[in-house]
Amino acid sequence: MDILYLENLKQCPDFVETFKRPGKYFKVNIEGMELEANYEKYEDNMIHIVRTGNNLRFYHWIHAYLAYKYFTEQGKKVDGFVIELVDGKKEKIKLDRLIIREPNILKELRKLKKGYRNPGSHCRFCKIKTECHRELLKKGDLTVIPSISEKVLKDFEMMNVDPLEVINNRDEIDDFRSFQRKALFNMKSVFEDKTLKLNERKLPDDYIVFDVETYGNHDFLFGFLDNDEYIPFFFEDANKNDFEEMIEYLDNRNKKLVHYDVHDTKALRKIAKFRPELRSKIDKILEDSLDLFDVILKDFSFPVTSYSLKDISKYFGFEWRTNLNGFAVLTVYQRYLKGDKSVMQEIYDYNEDDCRATRHVLEELKKF
């Protein structure tokens, strides 16, 4: 168990991360559990650990505790820890502050022994998600299907409705409320293993796809895919507001913007707060934008257990070049800020793949 994914492991002890965070890894046995964590360096009896987050959290203490156990088992002296967080913020912890928390740390770790496979948002970054969800479906757990929750199933039960029977008749599905109807179509798609088109939607032919990478509150990379050309705009300095070139490019191209989820458009709109003179152009650029995720939620159902861009695009045959995800980008960019400039290419590749995957999905949807 990689303790850097503690919150995921608490939801499901079988969680297997898709991305291994940078650092020197070690394993340590705590009360019969083989746990894994990492550290940046061991220097002057101090263990240095790099994590994301703006403030020191309890899971950081657990991470430090595992490192303490590992180094003391190696016969090394430990006086304390340095936890480096977002934007170079460093928290220094003396060993006695950690030891005081040992009972609560062990209590939290013991919870991992009592866990069971429980599908949820934590599944997004799990390597065995597809196989696991398939097994759960065979056992009758319908909650792995998007839009199917315990509450939705309870509602069907109170209505004396068997959803597995209803999905055999499309006309019957149309009689339900909108959120129930979408849940039933998603279920039908999974069990029939085919994509379902629920509504007619005119999709654009001439457009620019864009995707934004964010670190903390800093939107540092705006990537655009115009036809087959990838055009990135990198804003390394969070205090510089030199957005003119990017806004002029979009304004001159005068094409519909396509994105996946609302984060990207929010990032563009946020620019107007720093540069109010660009507001009218930004509003014009975004007035006819298309959220492909919204299209998918409303107009299609797919035989997958997650509607993330990665899962939908992989279903349509898209191949990603990196193991990064939205959260992993934080840790990789953190390495860049610490001086490892070589990692930036991986972020560019990931951002470009996000754009190309979005276009790939959009073009596939046009075939239905």
Listing of model-derived features with the role each one plays in the protein:
Residues 216-219, 227-229:
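Polyanion-binding interface signature
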Residues 67, 126, 149, 211, ...:
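A residue-level signal for conserved active-site and pocket-lining positions in enzyme catalytic cores
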Residues 21-32, 36-38, 43-110, 230-330:
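Conserved DEDDh/DEDDy metal-dependent 3′-5′ exonuclease domain
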Residues 102-139, 312-368:
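Acidic, Mg2+-coordinating catalytic module of metal-dependent nucleases/exonucleases
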Residues 8, 160-165, 235-238, 308:
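Alpha-helix N-cap recognition
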